[in-house]
Amino acid sequence: MAIKDWHEEDRPREKLLNLGAEYLTDAEILAIFLRTGSKQQSAIELARSLIDHFGGIAELLAAPKEAVLACHGIGTAKYAQLLASLEMGKRYLNSELKSGNSLNRSQVVKDYITTQIRRESKEVFAVLCLDNGLNLLDYKVLFVGGLSSCSVCVKQVLRHALEQGASQIIIAHNHPNQDATPSAADIHLTQTLKLACEAIDLRLTDHIIVGRNQTLSFAETATAPF
């Protein structure tokens, strides 16, 4: 049965408008973005099949283009709608944080960074520049590496932070197709950068690693040197 033939109170759009987003399942939210299903499936059924196949909305949005387009019922138009929804969320978060909402909680930081770099197929290294109140001054990917490593220039990180007038920074990188467990090289870089920051009265607040299914905070897990 097509969604338009459902009782009004069961239709995702009507539920969203009448009750609020918190009353919708992940599949119902996704169905609204998909707008239509296929000849064999309603938008809800298509959304459920995508979530089941990839393991969740986050995993779907992080999946390679080829993997998503290989799913029955998904063409380039629907894939573009999914990418646009992700980009809208990223831009909303960026706008909110730059308008004065501070990164004063570890989960907020992890959520923000995860949306920024989780889809990257190569390892990237990013820097968040913050003022004393933990308000975001600037976010930038400074280095792009390969599938399993990324060379980082400590001097360039410090120069960028000073140019932005930062009082403190948070660094972040991803582990494409791996978990978020920090390597010995990750820990060594963090220790080196923390000492370099202290030498110029700049605080390194945290190091975030975005893995395949997890995001890790050095500060939250008391990983050296925090």
Curated annotation (Swiss-Prot):
Span of the annotated motif JAMM motif: 173-186
UniProt keyword annotations, A-Z: Hydrolase, Metal-binding, Metalloprotease, Protease, Zinc
Positions bound to Zn(2+): 173, 175, 186
Coiled coil: none
GO molecular function, one term: metallopeptidase activity
GO BP terms in the entry: proteolysis
PROSITE patterns with a match to the protein in the record: MPN (PS50249)
Domain MPN: start-end pairs: 102-224
Family annotation (PANTHER family): DNA REPAIR PROTEIN RADC (PTHR30471), UPF0758 PROTEIN YEES-RELATED (PTHR30471:SF3)
Family according to the record: Belongs to the UPF0758 family.
Name of the protein: UPF0758 protein PsycPRwf_0491
UniProt organism field: Psychrobacter sp. (strain PRwf-1)
Organism taxonomic ancestry: Bacteria, Pseudomonadati, Pseudomonadota, Gammaproteobacteria, Moraxellales
